[in-house]
Amino acid sequence: GPVIDQCFNPTTRRLQKSRVPIIAAVNGVAAGAGASIVMACDIAIAAPNASFIQAFSKIGLIPDAGGSWLLVERLGLARAMALAMTGDKLSAAQAKEWGMIWDVAEDCVAAAVAMAERLAVMPTRALTATRHLMRDAGSRTLDQQLDVERDTQSALGRTHDYFEGVKAFLDKRSPQFKGE
């Protein structure tokens, strides 16, 4: 009830609706809502000792914080169903192999910071648009997605960052994006 409505669900919704990419670093066990919140992030990097578990079935509950939707979205129905029903633990290596997380790194925090620094110098409007296109793709048909891609590409093709990216490529130098 109240904890789900006041804490977990608003957190998952905020992560899903964010304008900027969300990066998670996981060191240890991400259980229940913790695992769901990791899956709500755009990029997750885990330490080798990290694991993910949805053990709700072992105590007579169901996945929360979006877990029932996020597991299916990330892993597919068969894997999501088995994990939710058995409460089995998923290792970091298996989570990477199955597509739950992006990578496994000895120092997951340093790797997450490095990823954030890498994204910070990229064309932020394009990253935001890519994030929204990917997040919303499942609710559209292919024809609808093609139209949204066309419209988004057209808008981004008139930005400073696009012109800077093309010029930098032609000049054989690194681009200096401004988010404009």
What are these regions (language model features)?
Residues 1-26, 74, 157:
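An acidic, glycine-rich surface segment that forms the CoA-thioester-binding/catalytic face
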Residues 5, 9, 32, 62-65, ...:
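Glycine-rich phosphate-binding loop at the start of an alpha helix
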Residues 16-24, 39, 49-100, 116-119:
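Conserved catalytic cores of soluble enzyme domains
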Residues 24, 28-34:
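Gly/Ser-rich catalytic serine loop of serine hydrolases
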Residues 32-33, 50-55, 108:
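Short glycine/proline-centered loop/turn elements that form peptide/ligand docking sites
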Residues 33, 39-40:
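Left-handed beta-helix
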Residues 37-38, 95, 112, 169:
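Hydrophobic/aromatic residues within transmembrane alpha-helices
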Residues 45-50, 96-147, 154-160, 176-180:
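C-terminal long alpha-helix characteristic of the crotonase
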